[in-house]
Amino acid sequence: MAEKICITEIDKLSQKLLRIETELNANIPTTLWISDLHGEGDRFKSILRGRFGMLYQTCKEGLPATFTPEKIQYLAKIVRKKNYFADSQQQMDRQDVILCFVQILKYKLTNSTNRNREIFLPEFRETIGRLLAGLPVPDPIFEESIISDRLIFHLSYAIRQVLLDRIQVLGDVFDRGSQPDKIIRILSSPAYKEMVDYVFGNHDILWMGAAAGTPSLVAETLRITCRYDHFRLLNRLRFDTSRLAEFAERTYEIKKATGKFKAKTDRGRAMEKALTVIQFKLEEKLINDFPHYGMEKRLWLERLAEMLKTGATEELNDSDFPTIDLENPSKLSKEESEIINDLIEQFRSNKYLKRLLKFFFEEGSTYHISNNFLNIHALVPSTKEGEFEEFMGHKGKDLLDYIQKVIRRTGQNYLYNREQSADDLALFFYLWCGPKSPFFGKHAMKTFERYFLLDKERHAEHSLYWQKNMQSDAFKEKMQEEFGIQRVIFGHTPVNYMQGNKMASEDGVAINVDGGFAAAYYNRGHALVHTPHQLYGIILPTPDELIKAAVRLEPAPLDIEFIDEFPQPLKIKNTIAGKLLQQERDLIMGKIQSYNSQNRDSDIN
């Protein structure tokens, strides 16, 4: 009996060992990086549908090197149209196209473990399987055009399904765009959820903190939303801002709202100003309650009250602050208090928002490591001297791990309606705008100055040391050692492509990916693609270019920044995950050898 158990166990271990060996020798997954989507849902959906220009590159990798760019473009166009058409220049018939498509699919599916048969629609699944296996198929497949055309349709569908294995989003679904909800629904949908890795951005932290119940972040979230007149977003999320709107329009005359308010509607402008004042009052309370944050320089209301009291308002562009008590400027008026308390409760209990943010709290992280890459939104806090900056007793990887624990705990309390810790809620405020936050990276967020001070020099928000340090070999080596990685991928900071700036450092260790989805950055958005053969950046098309390309059924114009090329396709065994799998394989092999030794001893006895 013992011998039978031993043999059964050897069989189980052998199967596990073979699965690990297969995975180790599989190609790394083709991965897309995108960052800073900034609420631009339609543009994101459009570019995602086109797979960020990956179709041409995949066809190029999967087909013989003798194929001209024109021939590859012709085949890619058929995939997009899902329909064969003749081209006198290329002289390829339906059979030629079918065999090329099979070759592309075989390239993507060979040495890959993360595929399943769902990439094929059921009608031609068996036929495609035979073609991939090199088995004969019935003659009508090639001889009857109506059947060939349907097969080309199904092959085109399958090719689009296998273009992309993983999507790494580097944060900031929220900001100035009106459709963050659309983006989250796409990323969390059954079609994409299992292939998405998400790291938080500072604007995500803002909304997450507001939903958890941080008072100042509730005011700030709504202030930014009103600043861009995104009332449809608030309506879709079922927020009731009628009381706020009535108070704002009654309290703040539009002609007196002369600060740098951006809302285009009178209603939005009044609400923006009302929320700005409420936000500053709530921030002052939090900063005073948590002096160890060292943010006392952000306390402006005492100074504002003194200006208003003495009439020395020449530095200001706006002096209409009817709800500020000059003797106690950070005190909320009775009506402000009632309004913000109602809004806080709406944020905490809003089921529509909770459905969206569940994806962040449960699936998101402060950083993510894959294929020897560290993925972060903005930075790892560092000092002028190139050391890791300490915050609350933590630094480097330990700091990001600590923040992750707080976010996860806060998220669980939020999702299951449990009481929150005041310290945890306050931390979200610091993560949003504190100088040592891994999501921000500047010495201060100058919201007050930009709204109300005439002197533009005081509006400047100076970046700290991350960008400079990431140009230093010593700091890059420090990052590699701290996280056990080879490259660092980060977003948050736009890369000005129009001025000739590059995404990657010369050695390819530091790569700055910013999707440029905010309207101000439409001409400098980037994505990053890693295939088993290449690592390259894509300069994304503008919305106008996307529309014109869709009409012509052609790819939008893309510029490529090649970062690295690999003579042999990269395998899982070449990655950090592969090293862990190799350790697991060695343990299993040790057990198998132990059982084998026991069997030999048993035979001898």
Swiss-Prot record:
One GO process term, biological-process aspect: gluconeogenesis
Domain of life: Bacteria
One Gene Ontology MF term: fructose 1,6-bisphosphate 1-phosphatase activity
Keyword Hydrolase recorded: yes
Pfam families: FBPase_2
Catalysed reactions, semicolon-separated: beta-D-fructose 1,6-bisphosphate + H2O = beta-D-fructose 6-phosphate + phosphate
Protein name per its UniProtKB record: Fructose-1,6-bisphosphatase class 3
Source species of the chain: Desulfotalea psychrophila (strain LSv54 / DSM 12343)
